[in-house]
Amino acid sequence: QSKSLGNVVSPQKVWDSLGADILRLWVASTDFRSEMVASDEILKRTSDQYRRIRNTFRFILGNLSDFSDKDKVMFEDQVELDKWIINEIKTLQKEVISLYESFSYHKAIQKIHNFCVNELGGVYLDIIKDRLYTCKNDSLARRSCQTSLDCILNILVRLISPILSYTAEEIWQTSNRLNSQEDSVFLSNFDNFVEDSKSNINQSEWKRIFEIKDAVNQTIEEMRNDNTIKGSLDSIVDIKATADDMSVLKKLG
């Protein structure tokens, strides 16, 4: 940007039109060791990135309205998928804190965004919708995924707070699950919200599960495009699995 060329993007205008957190997100997403570039297109992408993170919190908060400490499920009693996502968010917590400590803010926010897009939006949140919306309110299946959502909320709101400070505080003040702990997210500490896993999370097994899931979804999509079926609910899936795959499906399915 150059004042003489008249291509300067005013931070105050960005603040006024898009909000302080999107300005903060743009700054944090850029490697400060290299040239920082701003344009309407870059700020639009930053806004999209922000909305993805914010919408993730909206989903989580909306599905914890009837959840309290007495509803928590012990880790060993949780559904296997819910154990997996707890392991993933705990791993993210360690990685992001390490990146903050090394001032790698752009890598930290990238990891947070990718987690919201991939592990949550692309896998976990989509799978648990049936349990959240169709199971009995106090059923183990529903309380199990709510326990994991509660853990994700507690960790994720703290992870975004150094960058998306206003959003993190808004989330904190909105949620009784959070504001009952401290008056502000910035007065809270990172606690161990779930005991360290006593169960070995085999990443290779979960990788295979998701590969099988993707293959099934691809076949269903092809059948929808051919007008063989109208939607996934019209399909009956038979999986011809190897002995190893069958063992994994029985264990984690």
Please annotate each region the language model reported.
Residues 7-11, 110-114, 118, 169-177:
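Conserved alpha/beta core surface patches that mediate binding of polyanionic ligands
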Residues 19, 53, 119-120, 165, ...:
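Conserved structural-core and active-site-/substrate-pathway-adjacent residues in large, well-folded domains
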Residues 25, 60, 99, 122-123, ...:
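Short alpha-helical functional segments enriched in proximate histidine and acidic residues
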Residues 100-107:
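Short helix-adjacent coil turns
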Residues 120, 249-252:
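TRNA-recognition modules of translation machinery and tRNA-sensing kinases, especially anticodon-binding
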